[in-house]
């Protein structure tokens, strides 16, 4: 049995009333460690702490450990394989990653990052050679979130394996001509390569957490086996300041996601300077993650420190490691061995430890993140750990190998070019076969066919199931119900029976859940608003998923719709957590690619807390080619009438219109919703189009009419004729457009126009101004590029072609929403909207305040007719008086 280390005995001797007793306790613990191992020792310590607390002993909580490696040398798993070959592969990968950025920026300013992958090369190399499995017959493979700025290194490895060509590398960040590769991981741009977009920073970590949990969801519901699959997420230490990076780590700990591994590349630098110059980011992150219930493995020092630490019998080296702040550590790696000797080994005792070392020996003291032996041991421990997610904190050097051109320098992140001298030093450090006269060119280097290095790389990936990154683009198509399955919603609700479009959605959802072929694929997601949307019936019907089941008797267990949690439940209940719910939705919406099984997610939320709050995740979902339905509930500026400024959504459709593969609709009637959702199911799950849907639904109850005959395709296109005015009438005529609940005000305005002013109206439901605008712009583009062909007509122009009179549109959204179609309206076009701050009041008063109700629509129609000379202007003045409209009323935009 080895003796208790002196640094432990001496650490608190000044406050030790009985050193002999302390020695005996530590000797006893050492005996347990030697005879029964660390697990038994940890158990006994936990029991002692528990007993002490019960008996009133208080002690401060220390979430951080010493600034040394978590895994002792004697417990370090030995890395298999040929490390000389792996080092050469890693060196080639480093060079080509650097060359790619330098070559791309010789004649352009497209940018790119050298320093991030330079610091992380070993972290990725060990994973690709030994751990990360590709999808295969044996299983679904591991999911790897590559930190975005390290993309050049992943391309470099793919190039060495023959997966990418030199032409593609030379067109890094130059994609328009179809030859290039994307700046960061973008599945939209490289759909068979990248799986997960990890830029913007912070999105990768939170998405990885929910991917890991969704893997458990699929497994417990019997839809896809999780087995020992893992989700690996790589992020930078500076990235952890993004709220999304750490915002969900508590959930991961609480849910015991032992299929999740975070690897944080702690190169101590962010874009402008140190991450924590006056502190220690590794210690800070260790505390946060341990406090959240994670298993934390620190990989701080490389093997070249092992002998020094073994000789540190008094703990002076560990003390110095602990007191030295990150700003100092960074500076030391930007200098040289002499500087490190002077400033790190800064006491006589420490200097004596390296007295017989040269400055070069000191300079070669490596960091853990650059040591494949230490990284392998950490990865293996993480892969085998049960009951907790694991965090690996790997200390590295930003710009490793860049020398005077960037190593550990504050400018490292922005370096896109390097002088020849720096390139020469890089070549020499990694012993690469590039001649001096080639350095200016920075050529790519490869392993010849049949070389042991190339065969080694291929065999490593073959052993792990195939190449990564790789992305599956299709899964088995689902049998989508015909529109007739929703026949009840195509009929009128009947006199006196009022429902909301939210209620109609819940009815459609229930129909799908009960469908024998696709019901199990439906994933309802709600952020603590099921009762708001009338969905509490799902609690008992399909249950709320919880991998621990339900360990308590719910308060409402004797009621029909009691709160039921189950290991096989179907509803994902996220609590007040829109970002988490959106990540749930993304995991389900990309399940066809990540797990080979199509899932149909429906995420319903207050529309104001959708894209306005988690817009970057909506863009990431688009990039990932997500398929599913987002539903903005209580949508529109005036529909959520009592909540006030922050809660009233007048712009979500405008935001969603910017996302190219997001298809959005604002339906008024239940038949519109049924038609749109059935068509969406067909497009996404039968045809497997890479689109997703945003639908707004309301909580306002009213009667719904029967669907007019033959309008299904026009509803999908975004505009259909709801009702035609009296034909062959010589009366003045207008075309009235609307969507959502405000279309009902437009219908009422048509009645006022006829009754009070003798004006005929044709009524057009416009469930998607966005789709109308997209189709219109596409038609315009075709006509621009095909001047000698018969011009095409947009759906808007075609619909209004034979109609007469000015066109007036009113919606519950800002004017920009309906303004989208102005270029395609073939006559005078007037748009009403809810521009301005929201406020609380009744719906009637709010609609009057925002000037979108039936009276303002009527006034706008009369004014448009007067402007065209169809009626006198005195009629407009008369209407203002008749409807008690205040000419001096403030513009709602200004108050």
UniProtKB/Swiss-Prot annotation:
EC numbers: 1.2.4.1
Q: Coiled-coil intervals in this record?
A: none
Name the UniProt key words of this record, in alphabetical order.
Answer: Oxidoreductase, Pyruvate, Thiamine pyrophosphate
For this chain, one GO molecular function annotation is: pyruvate dehydrogenase (acetyl-transferring) activity
Q: Which NCBIfam families does this one have?
A: aceE
The function of this protein is:
Component of the pyruvate dehydrogenase (PDH) complex, that catalyzes the overall conversion of pyruvate to acetyl-CoA and CO(2).
Tell me what this protein is called. Answer: Pyruvate dehydrogenase E1 component
């Amino acid at each position: 049995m080895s003796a208790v280390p002196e640094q432990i005995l001496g650490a608190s001797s000044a406050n030790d009333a009985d050193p002999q007793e302390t020695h005996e306790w530590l000797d006893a613990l050492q005996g347990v460690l030697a005879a029964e191992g660390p697990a038994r020792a940890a158990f006994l310590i936990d029991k002692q702490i528990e007993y002490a607390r019960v008996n009133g002993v208080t002690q401060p909580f220390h979430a951080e450990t010493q600034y040394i490696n978590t895994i002792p040398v004697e417990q370090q798993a030995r890395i298999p394989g040929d490390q000389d070959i792996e080092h050469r592969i890693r060196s080639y990968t480093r060079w080509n990653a650097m060359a790619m950025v330098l070559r791309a920026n010789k004649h352009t300013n497209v940018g790119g990052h050298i320093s991030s992958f330079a610091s992380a090369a070993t972290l990725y190399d060990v994973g690709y050679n030994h751990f990360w499995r590709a999808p295969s017959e044996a299983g679904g493979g591991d999911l790897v979130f590559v930190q975005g700025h390290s993309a050049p290194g992943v391309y470099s490895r793919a190039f060495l394996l023959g997966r990418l060509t030199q032409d593609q590398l030379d067109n890094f960040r130059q994609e328009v001509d179809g030859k290039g590769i994307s700046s960061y991981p973008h599945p939209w741009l490289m759909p068979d390569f990248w799986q997960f977009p990890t830029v913007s920073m912070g999105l990768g970590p939170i998405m990885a957490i929910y991917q890991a949990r969704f893997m458990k969801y699929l497994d417990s519901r019997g839809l896809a086996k999780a087995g020992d699959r893992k989700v690996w997420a790589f992020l930078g230490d500076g990235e952890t300041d993004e709220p999304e990076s750490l915002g969900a780590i508590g959930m991961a700990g609480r849910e015991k996601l032992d299929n999740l591994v975070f690897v944080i590349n702690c190169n101590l630098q962010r874009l402008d300077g140190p991450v924590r110059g006056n502190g220690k980011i590794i210690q800070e992150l260790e505390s946060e993650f341990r406090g959240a219930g994670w298993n934390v493995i620190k990989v701080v020092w490389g093997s070249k420190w092992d002998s020094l630490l073994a000789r540190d019998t008094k703990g002076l080296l560990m003390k110095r490691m602990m007191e030295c702040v990150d700003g100092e550590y960074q500076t030391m790696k930007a200098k040289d061995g002499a500087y490190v000797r002077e400033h790190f080994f800064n006491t006589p005792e420490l200097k004596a430890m390296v007295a017989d070392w040269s400055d070069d020996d000191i300079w070669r003291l490596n960091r853990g993140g650059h040591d494949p032996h230490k990284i392998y041991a950490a990865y293996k421990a993480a892969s085998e750990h049960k009951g907790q997610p694991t965090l690996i904190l790997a200390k590295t050097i930003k710009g490793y190998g860049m020398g005077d051109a960037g190593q550990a320098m504050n400018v490292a992140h922005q370096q896109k070019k390097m002088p020849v001298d720096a390139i020469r030093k890089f070549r020499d450090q990694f012993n690469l076969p590039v001649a001096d006269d080639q350095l200016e060119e920075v050529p790519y280097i490869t392993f010849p066919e049949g070389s042991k290095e190339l065969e080694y790389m291929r065999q490593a990936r073959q052993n792990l199931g195939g190449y990564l990154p790789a992305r599956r683009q299709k899964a088995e198509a689902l049998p989508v119900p015909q529109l007739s399955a929703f026949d009840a919603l195509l009929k009128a609700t009947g006199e006196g029976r009022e429902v909301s479009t939210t209620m109609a959605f819940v009815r459609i959802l229930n129909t799908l859940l009960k469908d024998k072929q696709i019901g199990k694929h439906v994933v309802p997601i709600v952020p603590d608003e099921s009762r708001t949307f009338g969905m509490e019936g799902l609690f008992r019907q399909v249950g709320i998923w919880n991998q621990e089941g339900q360990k308590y008797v719910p308060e409402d267990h004797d009621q029909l719709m009691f709160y039921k949690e189950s290991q096989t439940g179907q509803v994902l209940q996220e609590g007040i957590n829109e970002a988490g719910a959106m990540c749930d939705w993304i995991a389900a919406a990309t399940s066809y690619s990540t797990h080979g099984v199509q899932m149909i997610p429906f995420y319903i939320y207050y529309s104001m807390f959708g894209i306005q709050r988690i817009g970057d995740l909506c863009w990431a979902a688009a990039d990932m080619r997500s398929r599913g339905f987002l539903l903005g509930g209580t949508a529109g500026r005036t529909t959520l009438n009592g909540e006030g400024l922050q809660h009233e959504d007048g712009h979500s459709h405008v935001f969603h219109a910017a996302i190219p593969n997001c298809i959005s609709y604002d339906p008024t009637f239940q038949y519109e919703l049924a038609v749109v959702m059935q068509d969406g199911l067909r497009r996404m799950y039968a045809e497997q189009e890479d689109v997703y849907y945003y639908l707004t639904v309301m909580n306002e109850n009213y009667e719904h009419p029967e669907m007019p005959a033959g309008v299904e395709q026009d509803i999908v296109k975004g505009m259909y004729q709801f009702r035609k005015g009296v034909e062959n009438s010589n009366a003045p005529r207008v075309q009235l457009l609307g969507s959502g609940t405000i279309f009902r005000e437009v219908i009422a305005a048509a009645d006022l126009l006829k009754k009070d002013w003798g004006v005929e109206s044709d009524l057009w439901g416009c469930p998607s101004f966005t789709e109308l605008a997209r189709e219109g712009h596409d038609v315009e583009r075709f006509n621009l590029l095909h001047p000698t062909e018969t011009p095409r007509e947009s759906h808007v122009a075609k619909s209004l072609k034979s109609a007469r009179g000015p066109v007036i549109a009113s919606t519950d959204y800002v004017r920009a929403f309906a303004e989208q179609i102005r270029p395609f309206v073939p006559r005078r076009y007037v748009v009403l909207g809810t521009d301005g701050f929201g406020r609380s009041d009744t719906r009637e008063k709010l609609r009057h305040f925002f000037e979108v109700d039936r009276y303002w629509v009527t006034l706008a129609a009369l004014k448009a007719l007067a402007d065209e000379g169809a009626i006198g202007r005195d009629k407009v003045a008369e209407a203002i008086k008749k409807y008690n409209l205040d000419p001096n009323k403030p513009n709602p935009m200004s108050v």
